[in-house]
C-alpha cells in the first residue's frame, strides 16, 4: 500500500462494511513519512453533501474565513504542502467527495488522498484496492481470541473450542466487525453455542460497541447502511441473489433474477454496480468470472427476499440447477466430463435447490434432482451424500403421503440401491439392498417408463452382489433397453458394472474385452471417471497375464491422471494396483505406495480404507514382515466384510498369514473358503495357497492335486502371475517321491518364468523353497542338478506347463476315445502332429524313445487307429489336443 501511495495521488480502499477499511487506512496513514503530516476526515456522521468541504477544512484545523469559500481556503492552506489526507467513509457522499478530490488534487500538487468507501469514487486516475477479508485459518482466529480475552480474561483457544472458533470465523467470512461482535458474546456463551447461534446471526450479533458510529453498532446496521444506498433496481437484483450459495455466474443470474421489472440485458450492469458497492464479490475462476455474496450479506438478502413475497425466485433457482443436473444424463459426444466439472462447481447451489424443494414439500422435484446427480455421486466421490439425499425423503414418513409419480419414485429407489451397493452399507446381495431395486423394477414395469426401467434393471444387476449368473439377465435386458433409448450414460454404467463382475471372474481375456468395450463408450461421452477405472482393469488383466512392467506403467499413468483430476476413488484403486504389482515385483517401493493408498483412502472412508489396508498387507507379505501384514489385515477385514470380492481375496491373504504364523488349521479354512468362492486368477492363487497348507500338514497328495489344479486353471486362461509358485510346489513334491530330475526341471522352468515376468517369490516362502532346492541338489549332485535346471529353463512357458501337467497322475477317464488320453499321451500326439520323430519327442519330454513308442501304442489302441499317418490326420481334423 505504501508503494501504491508513493506512485499514485488517489487510492481508494474498497470493501464490504466491517472488513477493516478504516483500520487499515489509519495504519497506513500512521506509517506515512510525508513532510507536512496528515489529516483524517471522518465522513461517517456527515449526511449533507454540502458540508463535505467544511468537514475537511475542520480536519486540517482551518476556521471559517468570512468572504472566502471553504474550498478556496483549503486550496490555499494545503498549497504545496506534502501531506496525506484520509477521506474515511465516502460511499454515501460520492459526488461531493469527487468534487473535493478534483479541486484539491488539481490545486495542490504535493497532496495525496487515501479514501475508504464501500464503492469506488469513480474518478479518472483513481486506484482502487479491495480490502480482503481476514484469513479464517489464522488472522480471523487471532482477532477472535484477542477480543474474547478482553471480555473474558484468560480465554484461550484450545482443542475443546478450536473447531467452533474456526467455524465462527468461516461463517462470518473473516469480516473483522462481525468477528468482534461474535467474540463479545463469549462473556455469556461458549464458542460452540455462538457457532450454533449463527443461523440467526443478526439477532446474535446485535450488541455493538458504545461510542461506535450507528451503522457499526450491529451487524444488521452495517448492511442496512449499504442497502439503503442502492437504487430500487439494485435492491431488486440484490435480494434475488439470495438463493445462490457458494457462487454463481452471469447466465445463472439472468435466468433466476430477471423478470418484468428487471431486464435480462441490464442484469450485467446492475450486477457490476453491486460489485462496486461491495455487496457482491467477483472472483476470477480459471478465466471465468464467478460472483458470490458473503454469508452474512446473503442472509440479509434472504430476509429481504422473504419480505418481498417473491417466493418464485427460489423455484426459478431450483429449476435452473435441476436443468443443469439433468444435462448430465444426456451428454453429447465427449461432453460428459465438462458437464460433471460444471455440476461440481455448482454443487452448493444444487444442494440449496434440493434443500429448498424438500423443505417446501416439492418431493418430485427433489427426487428428480437427486437422481440426475448420479454422475456426481459416483464420479466425484459424493456417494454418502447422494445416499443421504435419497434417504432424507424415501425414509421420512412425512413425505409418504405426498403425491410422487411412480416413474420418479422407481428411479429414485433404483439409484438409491446402486449407491447402497457401492457403499456396501450391508453385505452386497442383502435384502435391504435388493428390496429397493426389486421394488423399483416392479414399479417401472408397471408404468412402462423406459428410462426408469433401465435404471431399475441396472440396480437389480448391481445389487445381486457378485453373482454373475444372477446379474446377467438384468444386465442383458438393461443393455438392450439402454441402446434402444440411446441412454449412453446408463449404458456406460451397465458395461461398467458388468466389468466389475468380470474382475471377480479372474479371467484376463474376458476382463480385457469388457474393459475395452466400456472404456471406448466412456471416452465417446467423455466420462473420464469410468474410462480411468476401465484402464485400471486393463492393468489388472496385464498383471494376471504376467506382464508386470506394462501393468505398473498403466496403473501409474492412471493414478497420476486421477490425482490431477481430484478423482480420489480412482487414485485409491490405482495406488492399490500399483502396490500389488510392486509387491509381486519384489520392489521395496510397495510399502510407500501402500502408505499413500491408506492416506488417500482415509479421505473417503468405508471400503476404500479397507482397500488401502489390503494394499499394505500385500506389501508387508512380499517383504516378509508378517507382523505388519497382520496389523494391516486386521484393520482391513472388518471394513471389507460387506464386499464379497474383497472379503474373498482377503481370505487368500489371511490364509498366507495364518500359514506363515504356524496356524495351518486356520489357513486351511481360509483357503477352502477362497477356493469355493472364486474363479480364474483368484482361484489359481487360492489353490496354490491351499497346496502350501497341505504340504505344511504333511498331505502330499492333496498338495499335488491343488497345485496341478492351480496350474490347469492358469493354463486354461493364460494366467502366468503366480504360476511359478505352483511349479515350485510341484517341484518339491516331485523330489519327495524320488522324481529328482522332474523336480529340478520344474524349478528351472519356474525360475525362467519369474525372470521373464519379473515376478518374485514372497519372502515368507523363501525358506521352504530353499529347502527343496537344497534337498534336490544333494540328491542329484551339482552337475546333474545344473543340467536338469538348464533343461527346464530352456522350455517355453507352454512346454513347461505341459511338462508339469504330465506328472499329475491318473484320473478317472473313459477307456477309449480322445477323452481317455493322459496328459503325457496328449503331448505325444501334439508333437507327432508337429512332425517330430520319436527320438526328437523323447528329447522334448525328457524320456526315452522306447517310452514314446509305448505311449503311441496306447494312443493307437485308445483311438482305434492303426498308424502314425492316420493319427496325424485325425489330430488335424479334431485340432491337436493340448
Swiss-Prot record:
- Alphabetic keyword roster: DNA-binding, Transcription, Transcription regulation
List the residue ranges forming a coiled coil, or say none: none
Would I find Kinase among this entry's keywords? no
The GO terms this record gives for MF are: DNA binding
Name any Gene Ontology BP term.
regulation of DNA-templated transcription
Q: Where is the HTH luxR-type domain?
A: 814-879
Does this UniProt record's set of keywords contain Transcription?
Answer: yes
DNA bind region: 838-857
- Cellular component GO terms held in the UniProt record: cytosol; peptidoglycan-based cell wall
Task: Relate the induction remark in this record.
Answer: Up-regulated 17-fold 7 days after infection of human macrophages.
A Pfam family it matches: GerE
Record-linked PANTHER family: HTH-TYPE TRANSCRIPTIONAL REGULATOR RV0890C-RELATED, REGULATOR-RELATED
Stated name of the protein: Putative HTH-type transcriptional regulator Rv0890c
Q: Which organism is it from?
A: Mycobacterium tuberculosis (strain ATCC 25618 / H37Rv)
Amino acid at each position: 500500500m505504501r508503494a501504491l501511495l508513493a506512485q499514485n495521488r488517489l487510492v481508494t480502499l474498497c470493501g464490504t462494511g466491517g472488513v477493516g477499511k478504516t483500520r487499515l487506512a489509519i495504519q497506513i496513514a500512521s506509517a506515512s513519512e510525508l513532510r507536512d503530516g496528515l489529516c483524517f476526515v471522518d465522513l461517517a456522521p456527515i449526511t449533507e453533501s454540502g458540508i463535505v468541504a467544511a468537514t475537511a477544512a475542520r480536519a486540517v484545523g482551518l476556521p471559517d474565513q468570512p468572504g472566502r469559500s471553504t474550498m478556496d481556503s483549503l486550496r490555499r492552506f494545503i498549497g504545496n504542502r506534502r501531506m496525506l489526507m484520509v477521506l474515511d467513509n465516502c460511499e454515501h457522499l460520492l459526488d461531493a467527495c469527487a468534487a473535493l478530490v478534483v479541486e484539491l488534487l488539481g490545486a495542490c500538487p504535493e497532496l495525496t488522498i487515501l479514501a475508504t468507501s464501500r464503492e469506488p469514487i469513480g474518478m479518472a486516475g483513481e486506484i482502487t484496492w479491495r480490502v480482503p477479508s481476514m484469513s479464517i485459518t489464522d488472522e480471523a482466529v487471532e482477532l477472535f481470541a484477542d477480543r474474547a480475552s478482553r471480555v473474558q480474561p484468560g480465554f484461550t483457544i484450545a482443542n475443546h473450542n478450536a473447531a467452533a472458533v474456526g467455524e465462527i470465523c468461516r461463517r462470518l467470512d473473516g469480516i473483522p466487525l462481525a468477528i468482534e461482535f461474535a467474540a463479545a458474546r463469549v462473556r455469556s456463551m461458549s464458542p460452540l453455542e455462538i457457532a450454533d447461534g449463527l443461523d440467526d446471526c443478526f439477532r446474535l450479533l446485535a450488541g455493538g460497541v458504545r461510542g461506535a458510529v450507528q451503522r457499526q453498532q450491529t451487524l444488521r446496521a452495517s448492511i442496512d447502511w449499504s442497502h439503503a444506498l442502492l437504487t430500487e433496481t439494485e435492491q431488486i437484483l440484490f435480494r434475488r441473489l439470495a438463493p445462490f450459495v457458494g457462487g454463481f455466474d452471469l447466465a445463472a443470474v439472468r435466468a433466476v433474477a430477471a423478470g418484468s421489472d428487471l431486464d435480462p440485458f441490464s442484469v450485467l450492469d446492475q450486477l457490476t454496480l453491486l460489485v462496486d458497492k461491495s455487496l457482491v464479490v467477483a472472483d476470477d475462476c480459471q478465466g471465468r468470472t464467478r460472483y458470490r455474496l458473503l454469508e452474512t450479506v446473503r442472509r440479509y438478502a434472504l430476509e429481504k427476499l422473504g419480505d418481498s413475497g417473491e417466493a418464485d425466485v427460489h423455484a426459478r433457482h431450483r429449476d435452473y440447477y435441476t436443468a443443469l443436473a439433468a444435462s448430465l444424463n444426456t451428454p453429447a459426444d465427449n461432453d460428459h466430463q465438462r458437464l460433471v466439472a460444471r455440476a461440481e462447481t455448482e454443487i452448493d447451489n444444487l444442494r440449496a435447490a434440493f434443500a429448498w424443494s424438500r423443505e417446501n414439500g416439492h418431493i418430485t422435484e427433489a427426487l428428480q434432482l437427486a437422481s440426475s446427480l448420479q454422475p456426481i455421486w459416483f464420479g466425484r466421490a459424493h456417494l454418502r451424500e447422494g445416499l443421504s439425499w435419497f434417504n432424507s425423503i424415501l425414509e421420512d414418513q412425512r413425505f409418504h403421503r405426498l403425491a410422487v409419480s411412480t416413474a420418479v419414485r422407481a428411479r429414485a429407489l433404483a439409484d438409491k440401491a446402486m449407491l447402497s451397493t457401492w457403499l456396501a452399507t450391508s453385505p452386497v446381495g442383502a435384502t435391504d439392498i435388493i428390496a429397493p431395486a426389486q421394488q423399483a423394477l416392479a414399479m417401472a414395469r408397471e408404468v412402462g417408463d423406459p428410462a426408469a426401467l433401465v435404471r431399475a434393471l441396472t440396480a437389480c444387476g448391481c445389487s445381486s452382489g457378485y453373482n454373475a449368473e444372477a446379474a446377467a439377465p438384468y444386465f442383458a435386458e438393461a443393455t438392450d433397453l439402454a441402446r434402444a433409448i440411446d441412454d449412453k450414460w446408463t449404458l456406460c454404467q451397465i458395461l461398467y458394472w458388468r466389468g466389475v463382475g468380470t474382475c471377480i471372474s479372474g479371467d484376463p481375456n474376458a476382463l480385457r474385452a469388457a474393459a475395452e468395450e466400456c472404456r471406448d463408450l466412456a471416452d465417446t461421452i467423455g466420462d473420464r471417471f469410468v474410462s480411468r477405472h476401465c484402464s485400471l482393469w486393463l492393468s489388472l488383466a496385464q498383471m494376471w497375464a504376467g506382464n508386470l512392467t506394462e501393468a505398473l506403467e498403466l496403473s501409474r499413468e492412471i493414478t497420476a491422471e486421477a490425482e490431477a483430476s481430484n478423482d480420489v476413488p480412482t487414485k485409491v484403486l490405482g495406488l492399490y494396483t500399483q502396490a500389488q504389482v510392486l509387491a509381486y515385483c519384489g520392489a521395496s517401493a510397495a510399502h510407500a505406495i501402500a502408505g499413500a493408498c491408506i492416506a488417500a483412502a482415509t479421505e473417503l472412508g468405508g471400503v476404500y480404507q479397507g482397500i488401502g489396508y489390503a494394499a499394505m498387507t500385500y506389501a508387508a507379505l512380499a517383504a516378509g514382515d508378517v507382523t505388519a501384514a497382520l496389523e494391516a489385515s486386521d484393520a482391513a477385514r472388518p471394513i471389507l466384510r460387506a464386499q464379497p470380492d474383497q472379503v474373498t481375496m482377503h481370505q487368500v491373504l489371511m490364509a498366507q498369514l495364518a500359514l506363515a504364523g504356524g496356524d495351518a488349521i486356520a489357513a486351511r479354512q481360509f483357503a477352502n473358503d477362497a477356493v469355493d468362492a472364486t474363479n480364474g486368477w483368484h482361484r489359481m492363487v487360492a489353490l496354490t495357497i491351499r497346496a502350501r497348507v497341505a504340504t505344511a500338514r504333511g498331505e502330499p497328495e492333496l498338495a499335488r492335486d491343488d497345485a496341478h489344479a492351480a496350474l490347469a486353471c492358469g493354463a486354461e486362461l493364460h494366467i502366468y502371475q503366480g504360476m511359478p509358485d505352483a511349479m515350485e510346489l510341484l517341484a518339491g513334491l516331485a523330489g519327495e517321491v524320488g522324481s529328482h530330475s522332474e523336480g529340478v526341471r520344474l524349478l528351472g522352468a519356474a525360475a525362467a518364468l519369474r525372470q521373464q515376468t519379473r515376478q518374485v517369490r514372497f519372502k515368507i516362502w523363501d525358506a521352504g523353497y530353499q529347502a527343496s532346492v537344497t534337498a534336490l541338489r544333494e540328491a542329484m549332485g551339482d552337475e546333474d542338478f545344473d543340467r536338469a535346471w538348464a533343461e527346464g529353463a530352456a522350455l517355453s512357458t507352454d512346454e513347461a506347463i505341459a511338462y508339469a501337467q504330465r506328472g499329475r497322475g491318473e484320473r478317472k477317464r473313459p477307456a477309449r476315445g480322445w477323452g481317455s488320453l493322459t496328459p503325457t499321451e496328449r503331448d505325444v500326439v501334439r508333437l507327432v502332429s508337429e512332425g517330430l520323430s520319436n527320438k526328437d519327442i523323447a528329447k522334448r519330454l525328457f524320456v526315452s524313445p522306447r517310452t514314446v513308442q509305448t505311449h503311441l501304442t496306447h494312443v493307437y489302441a485308445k483311438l482305434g487307429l492303426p498308424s502314425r499317418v492316420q493319427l496325424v490326420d485325425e489330430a488335424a481334423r479334431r485340432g491337436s489336443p493340448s
